[in-house]
Amino acid sequence: MAPAPGMAPYSDEPTGPFHRPEHNDESTGRMSHESESSVSTTSIVFDRIEERLAAKEGHFELDDHDPMKEADDDDNDLETGRFLGGRSSTQEEDFPAKNDGMNRGMRRTLIIVAGLLISAWVVGLFFYVSHKSYKPASQIEHDPQATVVQGTGKQVTLDQVMGSYWRAESHSISWIESPDGEDGLLLLKDGPGKDFLVVEDVRTQNSAGVNAAVDVASSRTLIKERHFDFGGQTHTPGRVWPSKDLKKVLIATNLEANWRHSFYASYWVFDVDMQIAEPLIPGEPNVRVQLAQWSPTSDAIAYVRDNNLFLRSLKHDKVVQITKDGGAEVFNGVPDWVYEEEVFSGNSATWWSEDGNYIAYLRTNETGVPEYPVQYFLSRPSGTEPAPGEESYPEVRQIKYPKAGAHNPVVNLKFYDVARDESFTVEISGRFADDDRLITEVVWAGGQVIVKETNRVSDVLRVVLVDVAARTGKAVRELDVKAIDGGWFEITHKTKYIPADPSKGREQDGYIDMVIHDDNDHLAYFTPLNNSEPIMLTSGHWEVVDAPSTVDLDNNIVYFVATKESSIQRHVYQVDLSGNNLKAVTDTGSEGYYDISFSAGTGYALLSYRGPNIPWQKVISTPANAHKYEHMVEENKELAKSAREYELPIKIYGTIKVDGVELNYVERRPPHFDKNKKYPVLFQQYSGPGSQSVNKRFTVDYQSYVAAGLGYVCVTVDGRGTGFIGRKNRVIIRGDLGKWEAHDQIAAAKIWASKSYVDEERLAIWGWSFGGFNTLKTLEQDGGRTFKYGMAVAPVTDWRFYDSIYTERYMLTPQTNGHGYDTSAINNVTALKQSVRFLMMHGVADDNVHMQNSLTLLDKLNMVGVENYDVHVFPDSDHGIYFHNANRIVYDKLTNWLINAFNGEWIKVANAKPQKKRSIQPILPIL
């Protein structure tokens, strides 16, 4: 299950204006005031007006801590604040306006003293301003650690967070390997004032910082024009992949999405010297191809068409069909739905050997996998027209979708010998049975292949080493996680081959892998390839993240990102292949959340700072590079300007202890937070296994809008089961999803409910995908005692309905853990009745979390007469819910529903009563 769209699902599509009423007026909408009592209704609004009138008449005065004071009445606002408070009638009684009886000389003395004080104040103010000690609020830099927000009056809007207003500008660099050995080359596509596709030396971006002795590679054009013609038609490149020798470019046009990562396209081979294109498949320019990949030797392209693998030789200008059994149920070289979604997170299951002599590819047989129908009522994803007379019927797409406990696709790794034009399979003794085998990673290691495979519930791992030329193989590592911590093995795609180089001290081939060590994920170096006892490169009570990032083979340095400073930060580190000299690359003296991408030769890198301050990006030389270089490529000045001008929420980070376990939280407070007021609180969470929602990234998202725009407190707590707090706290959830995740949200809510500034009667929780499941599970487990409201988008409601590879990793199979599946499902629906109200939303065409989940729960609710909920469904929308403006409706619905909840409207609905009949007076005739 991918991270929930609800975490950052903002659409790039233009949206209409969102009207935010200025007052809590029944006729215009109901924006909640954070200062209200636990049930805010219209009568209380009138009470507030009367209390303000009473205050004005002197019955009581509004002090700085008055809970009835509006947020915009803040005395600290430099433009509108009251520097000198007026006197009330009570004060006037104590200090009459007349000065009867005051000595004239004393009056003169007081006037002189007052004049001197005022003069001194004016001089001091002039000095303060002239020496730039004073800055208007709009000029003060954004401080993520601030506990007080300077008042500028500008509020964050839903339009902004739904659009791109608060999105940091971010650039990616397509680093490419030079055929001439130069490092730091990048691919520039459609750059301003440049040819369409250009190879440049990264140092040309700022040649002023380059040592004169360093040769900067000259730019070279690969594709000059933005369009190309073929057969009388004009085509525009969608995606491009240069060959390794940079003499040709593989181009994809007319891209059409399939699933989350996969797509169909027309492919072309573009000649750089001639500046002309030809179809990848000679004579068939319009054929839809699923995948195309260059050979590392630049003389051939492997591609998949109709689930069969082909080889286009450019040297001999011919096409060879490698497989012939592909079709609706057999995939060659590309993954099926579940492998694309849960294993490879991509559209390729084809791997070239570095010498171009072999192709490894996955053969997937879905024959035994049951189908699930996805209905489209308004669109036709197939692109076909309905038969005459069938226009009124929905299009149905049948997906081979293995649910928990059902038959999995059968996968086998096969090899193709290019020179012999021969496919073959290498038999490995002791392998998992067909229905109990997952192949999760394939890495070429010289003439050998490292293959990772697990059983279907992911608690036994085998690392197999295949000698392709000899057509033999054996398991070199076999681990049972039950003997380690009772959890599961994560799927990774970062295993790195380290070739032997005696001149560099590497006597034999090896590889770097992520392993379980010290209750965390750490890096290990296995050498030779068949060694099962590694050199540990990292250790300690912290984790490496999706590592290694890269390896500098010239200097035997491994670069990686880790949580060494804090579980909610990310810094870049380096360590020698010996496991010595671990040190930070980024500044660990300041909080930071970094990621990094390296050039092909590891001499340069794009370093991206994501928070907590305004994000920036720069190209740097790596520590081992003798030629130092640094160039800022993005400072996000416009974002920084907006952060100065707008009143962003106050973010408070910390930890809470639940059952002795420290859990990270972030609390977003309204900009003019007053601890003496009573605030409603919204808990937002995802809670999925290994995920993390609390981090130090700079974000202004929907949760920020809830705090800064609506005036509520918004809290996120990463409970047990989430990532980066140790495997012990992660794997505790195995076999019973939802038990601990819900428990920890309830425990956190009780902590907040006890705070003086929280209205314990107005607590809500929401989430999307796994977060939607945990929202419902929390309401079920809590039974209305803590959380009064919940909002669940695209929720799983029974793990028997979700895909096997994801679900069984955490739940085992229904056949072996039936009780766990029963208790993890949303079954105790009478407990949901104890909350005030909850909301569910789902996309009808969700191919990931099927609509079946919500429909089944609705039936359970009907069976026991539960009615305190609302439902909204979105035709033709998938898991992201975007079709026909749906994403905007999701967030409008969340917002308005939440406002009604915190304004007490759902309490009225729960006890709906008709008004008394008014007597009807007879109309008398006019005489």
UniProtKB/Swiss-Prot annotation:
Membrane topology: Single-pass type II membrane protein
A GO biological process held by the record: proteolysis
Pfam families per record: DPPIV_N, Peptidase_S9
Sites where a glycan is attached: N365, N530, N828
UniProt-listed InterPro entries: AB_hydrolase_fold (IPR029058), Peptidase_S9_cat (IPR001375), Peptidase_S9B_N (IPR002469), Serine_Prot_S9B/DPPIV (IPR050278)
Location in the cell: Vacuole membrane
UniProt topological domain (Cytoplasmic) ranges: 1-108
Any one GO CC term of the record: plasma membrane
Ranges that cross the membrane: 109-129
Active site per the UniProt annotation: S769 (charge relay system), D846 (charge relay system), H879 (charge relay system)
Main location (coarse class): membrane
Gene Ontology molecular functions: aminopeptidase activity; dipeptidyl-peptidase activity; serine-type peptidase activity
Reaction(s) catalysed (UniProt annotation): Release of an N-terminal dipeptide, Xaa-Yaa-|-Zaa-, from a polypeptide, preferentially when Yaa is Pro, provided Zaa is neither Pro nor hydroxyproline
Family, per entry: Belongs to the peptidase S9B family.
Record's protein name: Probable dipeptidyl-aminopeptidase B
